[in-house]
């Protein structure tokens, strides 16, 4: 079952749920197997991977998060007093020298909710990196195990109610990825997971996601994105595995295309998933 925006009754409506339940039951009686497909498409043709927006409307705490950068352009000798953005969690605060790529960790200059810093000579910018809700996305936070499990439980129960789980033989997940603005999906837990995985603090590395910070730029970005790929694996895909195994259902999924290890034209995260 792979509903689209053209499906009638409209996906997520009570009429759709009733029709889907009836279809599943008839397939079971006929000896046919049913696969539920959660698909996400950027042009909203496939609403099931987002539960049609119904899930995050009911559970806003599980909405996808994005990484936002707030940049303040400084002048040499300026006494900076800039408020910390309060719309999300502060992940990193740094200074970036535009001409040389040098970065400075400014955490010691955060006083309360304000960055207080005297700008040295050079062409410096102050950068805040904030993990905040992506109000433009109605996807679940796929980097979170709890959010992913809640999403799967929500969509499954809406279709089957308290019915026999044997009615469904397989779930298929397509397009589950970084469904936020410019694919900047992030997690408030990122720094903690990174430090546990690699043994050091990632906060000074954040500017490398947006700028050239010198010869280590590629290494830093690889470490950061590898951690995000791990969180996706330990988030949605582990939740999917646990959810379906507990119900005796087969789960399957696919990366954007199966040859990502041979021709990674799209994203390096695919190689981590294959690993």
Model-derived features: positions:
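N-terminal-proximal low-complexity accessory segments that begin disordered
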Residues: 1-9, 15
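Short hydrophobic alpha-helical runs that function as membrane-insertion/retention elements
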Residues: 1-2, 34-36, 253
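Conserved beta-strand edge residues that scaffold enzyme active sites
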Residues: 5-6, 41, 258-259
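Mature extracytoplasmic enzyme cores
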Residues: 12-222, 227-234
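Surface-exposed amphipathic alpha-helices with a cationic face
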Residues: 24, 28, 238-245
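Carboxylate/His-rich catalytic cores and anion/metal-binding grooves
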Residues: 168-202, 240, 245-275
């Amino acid at each position: 079952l792979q509903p689209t925006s053209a499906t009638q009754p409209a996906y997520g409506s009570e009429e759709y749920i009733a029709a889907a339940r009836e279809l599943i039951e008839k397939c079971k009686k006929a000896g046919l197997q049913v696969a539920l497909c959660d698909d996400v498409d950027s042009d909203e043709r496939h609403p099931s991977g987002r539960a049609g927006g119904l899930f995050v409307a009911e559970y806003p705490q599980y909405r996808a998060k994005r990484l936002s950068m707030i940049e303040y352009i400084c002048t040499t000798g300026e006494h900076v007093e800039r408020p910390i953005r309060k719309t999300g969690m502060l992940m990193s605060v740094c200074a970036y020298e535009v001409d040389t790529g040098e970065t400075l960790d400014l955490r010691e200059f955060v006083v309360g909710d304000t960055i207080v810093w005297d700008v040295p000579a050079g062409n410096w910018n102050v950068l805040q990196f904030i993990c905040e809700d992506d109000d433009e996305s109605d996807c679940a936070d796929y980097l979170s195990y709890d959010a992913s499990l809640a999403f799967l439980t929500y969509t499954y129960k809406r279709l089957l109610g308290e019915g026999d789980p044997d009615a469904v033989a397989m779930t298929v997940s397509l397009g589950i990825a970084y469904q936020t603005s410019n694919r900047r999906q992030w997690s408030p837990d990122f720094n903690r997971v990174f430090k546990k995985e690699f043994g050091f603090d990632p906060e000074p590395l954040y500017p490398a996601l947006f700028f050239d910070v010198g010869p280590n730029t590629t290494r830093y970005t690889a470490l950061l994105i590898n951690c995000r790929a791990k969180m996706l694996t330990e988030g949605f895909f582990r939740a999917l595995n646990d959810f379906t195994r507990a119900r005796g259902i087969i789960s399957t999924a696919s990366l954007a295309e199966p040859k990502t290890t041979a021709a990674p034209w799209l994203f390096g995260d695919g190689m981590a998933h294959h690993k």
